[in-house]
Amino acid sequence: MANGVIPPPGGPSPLPQVRVPLEEPPLGPDVEEEDDDLGKTLAVSRFGDLISKTPAWDPEKPSRSYSERDFEFHRHTSHHTHHPLSARLPPPHKLRRLPPTSARHARRKRKKEKTSAPPSEGTPPIQEEGGAGAEEEEEEEEEEEGESEAEPVEPPPPGPPQKAKFSIGSDEDDSPGLSIKAPCAKALPSVGLPSDQSPQRSGSSPSPRARASRISTEKSRPWSPSASYDLRERLCPGSALGNPGPEQRVPTDEAEAQMLGSADLDDMKSHRLEDNPGVRRHLVKKPSRIQGGRGSPSGLAPILRRKKKKKKLDRRPHEVFVELNELMLDRSQEPHWRETARWIKFEEDVEEETERWGKPHVASLSFRSLLELRRTIAQGAALLDLEQTTLPGIAHLVVETMIVSDQIRPEDRASVLRTLLLKHSHPNDDKDSGFFPRNPSSSSVNSVLGNHHPTPSHGPDGAVPTMADDLGEPAPLWPHDPDAKEKPLHMPGGDGHRGKSLKLLEKIPEDAEATVVLVGSVPFLEQPAAAFVRLSEAVLLESVLEVPVPVRFLFVMLGPSHTSTDYHELGRSIATLMSDKLFHEAAYQADDRQDLLGAISEFLDGSIVIPPSEVEGRDLLRSVAAFQRELLRKRREREQTKVEMTTRGGYVAPGKELSLEMGGSEATSEDDPLQRTGSVFGGLVRDVKRRYPHYPSDLRDALHSQCVAAVLFIYFAALSPAITFGGLLGEKTEGLMGVSELIVSTAVLGVLFSLLGAQPLLVVGFSGPLLVFEEAFFKFCRAQDLEYLTGRVWVGLWLVVFVLALVAAEGSFLVRYISPFTQEIFAFLISLIFIYETFHKLYKVFTEHPLLPFYPPEEALEPGLELNSSALPPTEGPPGPRNQPNTALLSLILMLGTFLIAFFLRKFRNSRFLGGKARRVIGDFGIPISILVMVLVDYSITDTYTQKLTVPTGLSVTSPHKRTWFIPPLGSARPFPPWMMVAAAVPALLVLILIFMETQITALIVSQKARRLLKGSGFHLDLLLIGSLGGLCGLFGLPWLTAATVRSVTHVNALTVMRTAIAPGDKPQIQEVREQRVTGVLIASLVGLSIVMGAVLRRIPLAVLFGIFLYMGVTSLSGIQLSQRLLLIFMPAKHHPEQPYVTKVKTWRMHLFTFIQLGCIALLWVVKSTVASLAFPFLLLLTVPLRRCLLPRLFQDRELQALDSEDAEPNFDEDGQDEYNELHMPV
């Protein structure tokens, strides 16, 4: 009211709004006059005199119809005073300052007592929910706030009389729909209760405006049947065109219009925008309250602050949760809203027979339902940015809008309102309610609304419209039920979200806003009626949704049952649209109905129409998925183009600022660890600066129970390969290095790397390629009559030199050139070696212990040896027993049993039995479980000999009589030749190739963007640590280690925290990864402490280790694309899978690529089997230039992209694949 606009009593006015300036007298030097003059000037008696002077209407005289020309003439004559109220105030010098606050309250109380009057018994006037209480509140608020100023606005100049036109919103020419925006929708009125039903407090007095309305009602004349009255003219208050008042007003309904005469209606129209002197005027603030002058900035500051208090609408898109409710009859034939489907991202339907939720699926819509939905939105009501906080208030405004847009009849107002306020039920209600289900109900619509109706002191935002009883008795909601008033209605404060809903609530994002879709058929409507509602802010409507999610959108569709409209399909259509990302973003940013219609057209452009033919297999629908992906790709490109065009033009659409800022920050803050700086050790310095500042958080982040579980799991995952490779390494090196050396090396290097490394999540361990190299170098030294351990010392020293040179030159960037072509060859070769070595060892067992028809007696055994005991190494003392009965068969059983148990536990991990977490635990511990089971089987068979693992007692080397913990660089038994000291640079370069490939590729896999590691990584620092520590390992006779791919990925997965707010059917997403150093230190320490379990380790048969070796070889082949393409050679083309390397490449060219890889593998196998086996890492390195230089001449870039692309992403689905399927690296 600060700008001088007098609020009209209700509905829109047919005349333009007149703003009356409030003249404020200038400040006088002395204001000591008594305040009685002001009281006399504004006395109620003076208002009564002004009103009572109105001449009474003589019913005997013929009535006259007034036109707009008469109203215009009346406004500009002396009978219609336009002087502001401030002109009647005393001169400024007679005013004095305000008395104290207590005196003002006492004077206001006396004024209340003077103006109190009993309620009128006549026809109820048009009430507004502000009243005197609201006026006093506003007056008190202005007094407490300090100062206000009215901006004078000149009234519009008089023009020629024209016929007034009334319109609300933006009516389309081609549709009778109504689109009401926030200013008008907020002020939508409601019909007040009659005076005999409205509660009156003792001592309360009506406001002057209510008294004036009552006097005007008492003077009302009989209604003329010839007079016409349009309800649209009174829907919005006139102040909606400018600054709307704080009160919500009640619209005049048909019954009240019939009770009033045409002259009264015209009189109401005329006076809504007039300046009626002395009637319902706010007090002009005294000039003494203004601290500064009229032009002083201090006086304008509070006014500017008040103008800034207007709340800005939130147009930022949120995550969505959609719920479809249909109008149904329960067992007692009472109508209620029943939830039949829901959307978080995909559709979930309630199965009618079992009342349980089905599996999430992509919603399939009929094209006709989409067209009907588009027509419904074009012709229905669209209420955008509606300022209501309760369901009754929203429902009332929706009903009134439907009446104004001629969708429903005025006499159906009560029935539609009762339908919208019916009780909501959900599938989980019956399951969770127990023996005492809660069924809140109410006696009538008025009682429900009354429970939600706050007092006027709560402010205009909380006011809820009420429904007048003078509408007459409403028609029954259902024809067969006369007691429709007693239906269960929506009641707030339900029993909250239930236990079943807690799991669903976890899957909904925190900032999600809900969409409620209400569809159904009712018997009392003649045509469908629809409304699309967007609230100005999300509100929590209790007992409406299955979960407590704030509601932002509502869609209502009611209509008769005899039409051809399928309300269920239409509700599914709007719900699917709201779950679509682009459409619900457009719904947030829509300014009118046309924006919604345009978004529907965009949705139709990206939709697929399937012809009405019978589909008898899923294979027939494969092309649909590919076509849909293509449409989505084009849709994203169009959206990206629009965003770029808007940003280039300097305009950013609402809701795009945040995404652009996030994208820009990511682009600017992204730091490529493989980018070369051009300076010596520049990459190493960057790694240290990037990673070491996070060292304190690396210790704090380990304080979580998930880290403890990861330590226990990865400990067994690291101990099993250490025992397996240690036993095989002892076999290959004739006991010079075995389990003891490998356990010590894993512990020491693991602790140092976890404390100093740039990526402490990498697990350092022994691998198959290093085992192959150790065997090749051992054979080379035996052939050249050289000491194997002394040669390893010089190889280690040269390894340190080469690593320093490589890190100084920032050579880690070369890992980008190692494509899956080389990785698959590497992994396939190592897997073949594992499988070959397993059966080769089994063949040796059958050779030493053949199946004979007759075996010698037990006395033939060597003295001092038991049947089922640990045998000494072949070089230690007497050889082990030979020709033992059942040894070969038991070894075969132990090997196959270990392999099958571990393999099927891995399959069980990816099955559908039990829960996802239970399957993961069982599958991840498959190797330890299989080892334990087979050891128990061997231990239970006491009369059959099996060769056991050789483990010394305590902290000792495997062969104490052959070596010590320190290896002399110049030789132990004889001097080491000097030429070999220099020539050791060649095997050092070869072992560097293996360490570089495995370490850098593993670090590259772990640091993928999809894994969401935030603290960064350091390729140069990690390579320097592993290479330097490998050089020290040579001095102590310990095996070289590298970053183990499978164990490192398993470690990262164990520390990954998945998001719980994932839509059912959507793929899991990573929330965070607990990047810390403590788990690596504890895992390495526990592996080191395992050396004290020598008595237990000595019980493990070597055949069990052969089974683990076979398991690692077979499982490594499953994730290699080469093995899948190899099988396609023997498969008809019609059975080929729908993979890019099949659909985008001709079959014979795909086979050519496969044969090239097989040729490389065959060449490497031949080299490995000869005396030149030491050179196989160099030949492996040659596959990199082969891929970069030769293959582009044979294949097109499009074919190479399909055949040699790194498109594997981490899979965290409970039913998905494990680490072996994701990696192209050897174990």
Swiss-Prot record:
Keywords: Anion exchange, Antiport, Cell membrane, Glycoprotein, Ion transport, Lipoprotein, Membrane, Methylation, Palmitate, Phosphoprotein, Transmembrane, Transmembrane helix, Transport
GO biological process, one term: bicarbonate transport
Compartments, as annotated in UniProt: Cell membrane
Topology of this chain in the membrane: Multi-pass membrane protein
PROSITE patterns, sorted: ANION_EXCHANGER_1 (PS00219), ANION_EXCHANGER_2 (PS00220)
InterPro entries: Anion_exchange, Anion_exchange_3, Anion_exchange_CS, Band3_cytoplasmic_dom, HCO3_transpt-like_TM_dom, HCO3_transpt_euk, PTrfase/Anion_transptr
Any GO MF annotation of the entry: enzyme binding
Task performed by this protein: Sodium-independent anion exchanger which mediates the electroneutral exchange of chloride for bicarbonate ions across the cell membrane. May be involved in the regulation of intracellular pH, and the modulation of cardiac action potential.
PANTHER family: ANION EXCHANGE PROTEIN, ANION EXCHANGE PROTEIN 3
Protein name listed in UniProt: Anion exchange protein 3
Taxonomic classification: Eukaryota, Metazoa, Chordata, Craniata, Vertebrata
